[in-house]
């Protein structure tokens, strides 16, 4: 209960301090109110001139920041695309290793054809008969 009383006392002190500060500001503003009447409360000519000078550099900075963010976005999306492709390949590899292999239907292999002997000629002379050697496969 004592903690609640301390909190309430601190809030009351804070409220009184704020009220005192605001009261002093209102007293100071009442003496300056005569000079404020002469100047309009809308944005004057000088303010618009200052804003127009600051508008071009501000737009340039905003454009540069936008361009850099766009480039960063493109590079990030490119990296994301490569990562997704690698992820799909890895998942496919894991699935191919995890799933059982279904054997294809067994077909009888065709017999290997017997090849004719290959002539090998050791001489450049056309008068001699070629020597026939059989190659064993």
From Swiss-Prot:
Quick check: keyword Phosphoprotein in the entry?
no
Origin: domain of life:
Eukaryota
The annotated consequence of gene deletion is: Dies at second instar larval stage. Shows reduced larval body size and shortened dorsal trunk probably due to defective membrane growth in larval tracheae. Results in defective tracheal tube maturation including liquid clearance and gas filling resulting in twisted and uninflated tracheal tubes. Results in mislocalization of crb from the subapical region to Vsp35/retromer-positive vesicles in the cytoplasm. RNAi-mediated knockdown in the trachea results in a similar phenotype.
Membrane-spanning regions, if any? 7-27, 55-75, 76-96
Q: Which GO terms describe its cellular component?
A: apical plasma membrane
List the residue ranges forming a coiled coil, or say none: none
- Please give, as recorded in its UniProt entry, the membrane topology of this protein: Multi-pass membrane protein
A Gene Ontology biological process term = positive regulation of protein localization to membrane
Q: Where in the cell is it found?
A: Apical cell membrane
Q: Which UniProt keywords apply?
A: Cell membrane, Membrane, Transmembrane, Transmembrane helix
What does the UniProt function comment say about this protein? Transmembrane protein that plays a key role in trachea development by regulating crb localization and maintenance at the apical cell membrane. Required for anisotropic apical surface expansion important for tracheal tube elongation and lumen stability at larval stages.
Q: Anything else of interest in the record?
A: Apnoia means lack of air in Greek.
Subunit arrangement?
Answer: Interacts with crb.
Name this polypeptide is given: Protein apnoia
Organism from which the protein derives: Drosophila melanogaster
Q: What's the gene?
A: apn
């Amino acid at each position: 209960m004592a903690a609640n009383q301390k909190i309430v006392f601190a809030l009351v002190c804070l409220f009184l301090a704020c009220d005192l500060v605001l009261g002093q500001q209102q007293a100071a503003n009442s003496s300056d109110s005569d000079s404020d009447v002469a100047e309009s409360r809308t944005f004057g000519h000088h303010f618009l001139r200052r804003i127009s000078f600051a508008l071009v550099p501000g737009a340039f900075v905003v454009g540069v920041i936008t361009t850099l963010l766009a480039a960063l976005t493109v590079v990030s999306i490119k990296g994301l695309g490569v990562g997704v492709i690698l992820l799909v390949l890895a998942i496919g590899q894991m699935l191919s290793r995890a799933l059982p292999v279904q054997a294809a239907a067994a077909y009888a292999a065709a017999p290997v054809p017997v090849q004719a002997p290959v002539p090998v000629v050791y001489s450049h002379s056309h008068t001699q008969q070629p020597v026939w050697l059989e190659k064993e496969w």
